[in-house]
């Protein structure tokens, strides 16, 4: 049964309204999407002389954390998480399409743009290095290598490039794809990487030589474009099923690794990176493109996939016939990105919606389940989010960085109230 995640948007500067401390009443709005064609506006009145707020009959609005607010409107609960650091104030204007982070001696961020540029930033979003025209068209993905001293980029120009963070040099370009390269996964220390493309292939590369070791395709349709991939280590059951295969001498760390792919057709495939076999195929349940997918970091049997029609599906790879959970976000509006981190799922939908959904343990089945009844909305000025990036913190639940169009680059704290 499909469940609907009700979407709400709060006035971007509502915190300023709350903190004005005026003698007179003021107000801000929360818009709740009832359906595609109907939006209900709730006016939250901030009473003068610090007398609290009036959210209307039967409704409430309160602060529950340093950057977290809760509204109960017409029986529905909504959480709103506000920005703790606005990186756009430090950056030259651009549309951001890719992000990653690494921390060795110091925290760094990398951002990719629609113009093909790469920006390397320090922990305060100060520009350390800019690689202009790293690609001739939009950058689709950026990944730091585990050393933190090199990164790899992919682009609509059909190429992948390896870069030195220290001096911006490009020691290797990986050429072979015949359409946009959509995604990257790094295996272990980075001698091997995987790349996905709209040409229907997933390529396994050896970075030292730039050699393609193997090309994966969907067996039933080799030209079915790949929008998104995720790498994971097989479960005990999956590892038991690995067939013996002679490893190429250019492969490092591929044993036990699987890559899952979301296709333009909506089909999802799983490939054993070591044996080179396609092991699972999930059907195109919603007859539209699977735009993005991610693996549950706490249980690799479960994956989450976002589709062109606004559906979010949870799949159990042990039961591939149909999803174990179906959720509708902004019906008819594409899901741009799904990302698992810190026990939660982050979802970008359409031009203006960014949601955090906690993953909980279902009390009956004990499987991971999406807690959809109280979504957390990451507050922005109706900005379209391209990608998410988790920033770990030993002292809390960490932070998440969002990047997107119109110079959007914002950091949110994930600590619980």
Curated annotation (Swiss-Prot):
Main location class: cytoplasm
Domain of life: Eukaryota
GO biological process entries: proteasome regulatory particle assembly; ubiquitin-dependent protein catabolic process
Keyword Repeat: yes
Disulfide feature: none
Mapped WD repeat ranges: 134-173, 176-215, 242-281, 285-325, 330-371, 380-416
InterPro entries reported for this sequence: WD40/YVTN_repeat-like_dom_sf (IPR015943), WD40_repeat_dom_sf (IPR036322), WD40_rpt (IPR001680), WD_repeat_multifunction (IPR051179)
Endoplasmic reticulum as UniProt keyword: no
Subcellular locations according to the entry: Cytoplasm; Nucleus
PROSITE patterns to which the protein is assigned, alphabetical: WD_REPEATS_1, WD_REPEATS_2, WD_REPEATS_REGION
GO MF annotations in UniProt: protein folding chaperone
Keywords tagged on the record: Chaperone, Cytoplasm, Nucleus, Proteasome, Repeat, WD repeat
A Gene Ontology cellular-component term: nucleus
Subunit structure: Associates with the 19S proteasome regulatory particle (RP). Interacts directly with RPT5 and RPT6.
Note: Present with 2210 molecules/cell in log phase SD medium.
Role description: Acts as a regulatory subunit of the 26 proteasome which is involved in the ATP-dependent degradation of ubiquitinated proteins. Is not a genuine component of the 26S proteasome, but an auxiliary factor that interacts with the proteasomal ATPase of 19S regulatory particle (RP). Acts as a chaperone which regulates the highly structured assembly of the 19S regulatory particle. Involved in the substrate specificity of the 26S proteasome and is especially involved in the degradation of ubiquitinated GCN4. May contribute to the stability of the 26S proteasome in some stress conditions.
PANTHER family from the UniProt entry: 26S PROTEASOME REGULATORY SUBUNIT RPN14, MITOCHONDRIAL DIVISION PROTEIN 1-RELATED
Homology family: Belongs to the WD repeat PAAF1/RPN14 family.
Listed name of the protein: 26S proteasome regulatory subunit RPN14
């Amino acid at each position: 049964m499909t469940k609907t995640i009700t979407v709400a948007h709060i006035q971007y500067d509502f915190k300023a309204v709350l903190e004005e401390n005026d003698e007179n009443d003021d107000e801000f709005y929360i818009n709740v999407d009832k359906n595609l064609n109907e939006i209900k506006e709730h006016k939250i009145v901030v009473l003068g002389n610090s007398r609290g707020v009036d959210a209307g009959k039967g409704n409430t609005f309160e602060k529950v954390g340093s950057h977290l607010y809760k509204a109960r409107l017409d029986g529905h609960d909504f959480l709103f998480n506000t920005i703790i650091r606005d990186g756009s104030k430090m950056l030259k204007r651009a549309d951001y399409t890719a992000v990653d982070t690494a921390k060795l001696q110091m925290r760094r961020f990398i951002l990719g743009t629609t113009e093909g540029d790469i920006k390397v930033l320090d922990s305060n979003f100060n520009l350390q290095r800019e690689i202009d025209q790293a690609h001739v068209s939009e950058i689709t993905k950026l990944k730091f290598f585990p050393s933190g001293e090199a990164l790899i980029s992919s682009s609509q120009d059909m190429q992948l490039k390896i870069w030195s963070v220290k001096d911006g040099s490009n020691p290797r370009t990986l050429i072979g794809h015949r359409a946009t390269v959509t995604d990257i996964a790094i295996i272990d220390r980075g001698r091997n990487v995987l790349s996905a493309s709209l040409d229907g292939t997933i390529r396994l590369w050896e970075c030292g030589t730039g050699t393609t070791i193997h090309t994966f395709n969907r067996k039933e349709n080799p030209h079915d474009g790949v929008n998104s991939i995720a790498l994971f280590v097989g479960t005990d059951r999956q590892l038991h099923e690995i067939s013996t295969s002679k490893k190429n001498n250019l492969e490092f760390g591929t044993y036990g690794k699987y890559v899952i792919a979301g296709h333009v057709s909506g089909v999802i495939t799983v490939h054993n990176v070591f044996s080179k076999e396609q092991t699972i195929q999930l059907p195109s349940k919603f007859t539209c493109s699977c735009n993005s997918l991610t693996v549950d970091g706490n249980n690799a049997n479960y994956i989450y996939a976002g589709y062109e029609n606004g559906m979010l599906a949870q799949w159990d790879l042990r039961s591939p016939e149909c999803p174990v959970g179906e959720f509708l976000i902004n019906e008819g509006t594409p899901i741009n990105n799904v990302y698992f981190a810190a026990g939660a799922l982050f979802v970008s939908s359409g031009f203006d919606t960014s949601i955090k959904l906690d993953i909980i343990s279902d009390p009956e089945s004990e499987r991971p389940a999406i807690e959809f009844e109280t979504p957390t909305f990451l507050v922005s000025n109706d900005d379209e989010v391209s990608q998410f990036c988790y920033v770990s913190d030993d002292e809390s639940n960490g932070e998440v960085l969002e990047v997107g169009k119109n110079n959007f680059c914002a950091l949110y704290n994930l600590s619980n109230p």
